[in-house]
Amino acid sequence: FFFQAEDGIRDVAVTGVQTCALPIYAHAAAVPLTGLTAWQALFEHAQLQPGQRVLIQSGAGGVGSFAIQLAKARGLHVISTASAGNLDLLRELGADQVIDYNAVQFEKEVSGVDAVIDGMAGEVRERSWKTLQPGGLLIALTGAPPTDAMAAERGYRQTTMLVHPDRAQLTEIAALIDAGKVRPILEAVIPLAETARAHRLSEGGHARGKIVLQVV
């Protein structure tokens, strides 16, 4: 994965142990950013352990779909939200409880979770606080970050994360892909010349998995 490289190209040779089972380049391109974001939220910031409970908002998205699979691979109890048309995908990815956020108020269905992975912000974040157990952690992936004071007023903790490159974590994710426990979900592979269409699709907020731009 050329996660830290930019503005350069060269020939390289890799051994079999440096590769993973993703024969389609678009699938490989979908792994580093979303995979590391999900991994670092779950295991670096929240430090979740087997048996703990996590609420993953927007589980059908790029980060959410990775987070569900990584959490289940670690033995977590996963609750996730999505629109009705994506609930089957969440179940397929391993979520223990799925919630249609358009049909019910998720905060009335969920309580006592150890962490919330929130990629939606706004009023969804405000409602997400109510699902945490005392001292639970809300991890904000987007939007205006909550403050420690806001969290303390509610009896919880919060953090805002910015993903960083990590070769060891990518190696662990690759091993899970090889083992068939994790797979990237793609909404679309779009030619670079149609970047504007890709942006419109992304900004619509209903992409199922990752949108990948194809350079050649």
Q: Which residues does each predicted region cover?
A:
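Terminal helix/beta-alpha structural elements that buttress the NAD(P)+-binding lobe
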Residues: 18-216
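Single conserved hydrophobic/aromatic residue that forms the stacking wall/gate
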Residues: 1-20
